[in-house]
Amino acid sequence: MKLIVKVFPEITIKSPPVRKKFIRQLGKNIRTVLRELDADIVVGGVWDNLEVETRLTDPKVLQGIRDRLSCMPGIANFLQVAEYPLGDMDDVVAKCKLHYADLLPGTMFSVRCKRAGRHDFSSMDVEKYVGSQLRMQCGAAGIELKKPDLVVRMEIRDQRLFVVHDQHKGMGGYPLGALEQTLVLMSGGFDSTVAAYQIMRRGLMAHFCFFNLGGRAHELGVMEVAHFIWKKYGSSQRVLFVSVPFEEVLGEILQKVDNSHMGVVLKRMMLRAASAVADRLEIDVLVTGEAISQVASQTLPNLSLIDAATDKLVLRPLVATHKQDIVDLATEIGTADFARHMPEYCGVISVNPKTNAKRNRVEYEEQQFDMAILEQALERAKLVSIDRVIDDLSRNIDIEEVSQALAGQVIIDIRHPDAQEDQPLQVPGVEIQTLPFYALNSRFKALDDTRQYLLYCDKGVMSRLHAHHLLSEGHANVRVYRPS
């Protein structure tokens, strides 16, 4: 399979050195991400396109390559093509017939040709000749330039002909690694996950910073969704997941700060802590998922006060986005189900919160706060490479594993729905339920507690993590299923 990758149009208007830098970075990213699927993948570059070629023929691998390219920042679109040496016009017609002859009968079609190099013909010459010949030779109903049923696409570059099979849309944006780094404040809900995606889509590397207000289950949930976002949209780069224990900070706020100002003060403490983490990582920009007036702490006066707690630039990609649009985008990018089952704490600690807090009052409330508690939280912060975050969590967990399931036991397949659909788990004589990992903790309590449940995932890592959490919650009827 051969693919021609078209770069983000804004890259093509850069100066030659910058353009070259961005395209080189994109090629590097493509190799990094596709190497897992094909160790011998070939990526070549020209001025405004990249060519990707694999010799593998497994349909699942080829689909995996297309899926990963469609989720990679820096790519406007990519074409699946068949390459031939350029012959005369009749040879071009013959090559097009190989791919379109069965599709043309009875259709209104057009021909589109893009050309680069020196030739004694124009792109329009090719379109006219090939179109007329295909109409006569393939039984097409006619030629329609404005709204054709089918478009015969090709590209000619120097002495090479590319007949286009299909065109796939990319993410756009700049390639990760070519622009600056950011630190995204993650709660795991709809807003923060979509904000992280928007930043990555534009081409900015996103490290993840989580303030743990809700214990182990909340931390695990945020780690899972952060890993999902990174793996799907940003795995060409290695980034960090930072977890800051914020329970004691929250407790100090609840004890010392007036109820109406708790939300603003909590957000200011988070920005102070995030700034300290960013300094440690040499990052100049913070990212949050806040939108104007979505909650009381997000009015313009309050956002201004919150930003005053840091010297860092604070980006809010969703600042003017409606909530339903955020939810729709979360559904599109795959984070909505994570968010629906994620505990949320920030919005419930204030009663009658101030929507127009005053600086002097906020500073007065913060004078009651023991800043040593914030410093202690930062000292206990954990930094883990995002690609190891799930493995590190499960490393010291001792959970009973079984290699065979017995009649009467229930296997719960906790893999992502995509994996469940692609490779359904089948164990003869044993009941199997599908319950994705991000919904397991919230739905497990509704299951029959007289049954014994075996959690299953591909590598056993996620199943061990969730089994450990369920056992710690008092559910003694949980094991891990690891078939031999």
Curated annotation (Swiss-Prot):
Pathway it works in: Cofactor biosynthesis; thiamine diphosphate biosynthesis
MF (Gene Ontology): ATP binding; CCA tRNA nucleotidyltransferase activity; tRNA binding; tRNA-uracil-4 sulfurtransferase activity
Gene3D superfamilies noted in UniProt: 3.30.2130.30, HUPs (3.40.50.620), Rhodanese-like domain (3.40.250.10)
Domain THUMP: 63-167
Keywords: ATP-binding, Cytoplasm, Disulfide bond, Nucleotide-binding, Redox-active center, RNA-binding, Thiamine biosynthesis, Transferase, tRNA-binding
Main localization category: cytoplasm
Enzyme Commission designation: 2.8.1.4
Any Pfam family the entry gives: THUMP
Keyword Disulfide bond included in the entry's annotation: yes
Disulfide bonds: C346-C457
GO cellular component, one term: cytosol
Catalytic activity: [ThiI sulfur-carrier protein]-S-sulfanyl-L-cysteine + a uridine in tRNA + 2 reduced [2Fe-2S]-[ferredoxin] + ATP + H(+) = [ThiI sulfur-carrier protein]-L-cysteine + a 4-thiouridine in tRNA + 2 oxidized [2Fe-2S]-[ferredoxin] + AMP + diphosphate; [ThiS sulfur-carrier protein]-C-terminal Gly-Gly-AMP + S-sulfanyl-L-cysteinyl-[cysteine desulfurase] + AH2 = [ThiS sulfur-carrier protein]-C-terminal-Gly-aminoethanethioate + L-cysteinyl-[cysteine desulfurase] + A + AMP + 2 H(+)
PANTHER family the record matches: TRNA SULFURTRANSFERASE
Family assignment from sequence similarity: Belongs to the ThiI family.
Record's protein name: tRNA sulfurtransferase
